[in-house]
Amino acid sequence: MNFLRKIVKSCKDEEDQKPALVSAPPDDDDLWLPPPESVPLTEISGKKNMRNFCINGEVKICSPNGYSFKILRHILKSFDGIYSGNRRMIGLVKVVIGLALSGAPVPEGMNWVYKIRRTLVFQWAESRGPLDGEELEYSQEITWDDDSEFIGLQIRVSARQCHIQGRVWCINMNSRACQLWSDMSLKTQQSDEDKNTSLLLE
């Protein structure tokens, strides 16, 4: 068993920073709950505090025996407490993680890799969000480890403001992305300009 665990841990990239540890999920953690109150559903009509970002996101999952979204969701429920990036862009990072994990993974050795590369439109509430022209290069490893199972979650997100026409991060309210945003406690409020649009509060 120890030999297997050593092999498993070799699928992680070597990182200088110590990965954050997350405790085991409760047995009833796989319930599919309603998403947060409001996410963008249609084209954004209000232009207030709207910014386009060119996004490159990658979520790499290392696990020897496959993995369930039950454990991933449990890990992401602790995201606010373990996030090590720029706090002004944590909402953007949550959106990218949710969208990436809603796509199809590509096997890579003992890893499953989810990638997203697109231009997205974000709107923040007044005085929230990144500073004008601010960019993000965020990388973090989070692990869940006990005597029977190991899962390593590597997250990389780069974001820079760009002038390419972007898409709103609209998605079906019953989608996996919405559930993941709910797990990560994505903070939003309904826009005064457009009832179908949410402003990020983080």
Swiss-Prot record:
Statement: the UniProt record of this protein carries the keyword Phosphoprotein: yes
Subcellular location: Virion membrane; Host endomembrane system
Keywords from the UniProt entry: Host membrane, Host-virus interaction, Membrane, Phosphoprotein, Viral budding, Viral budding via the host ESCRT complexes, Viral envelope protein, Viral matrix protein, Viral release from host cell, Virion
Domain of life, per lineage: Viruses
GO terms, biological process: viral budding via host ESCRT complex
A Pfam family per the record: Rhabdo_M2
GO CC, one annotated term: viral envelope
Membrane topology listed for this record: Peripheral membrane protein
Region Essential for glycoprotein binding, residue ranges: 115-151
Chief location of this protein within or outside the cell: virion
Listed GO MF terms: structural constituent of virion
Coiled coil: none
Motif extent (PPXY motif): 35-38
Domain notes: Late-budding domains (L domains) are short sequence motifs essential for viral particle budding. They recruit proteins of the host ESCRT machinery (Endosomal Sorting Complex Required for Transport) or ESCRT-associated proteins. Matrix protein contains one L domain: a PPXY motif which potentially interacts with the WW domain 3 of NEDD4 E3 ubiquitin ligase (Potential).
Function per UniProt: Plays a major role in assembly and budding of virion. Completely covers the ribonucleoprotein coil and keep it in condensed bullet-shaped form. Inhibits viral transcription and stimulates replication. Plays a major role in early induction of TRAIL-mediated apoptosis in infected neurons.
Similarity remark: Belongs to the lyssavirus matrix protein family.
Record's subunit section: Homomultimer. Interacts with nucleoprotein and with the cytoplasmic domain of glycoprotein.
Protein name as annotated: Matrix protein
Organism: Khujand virus (KHUV)
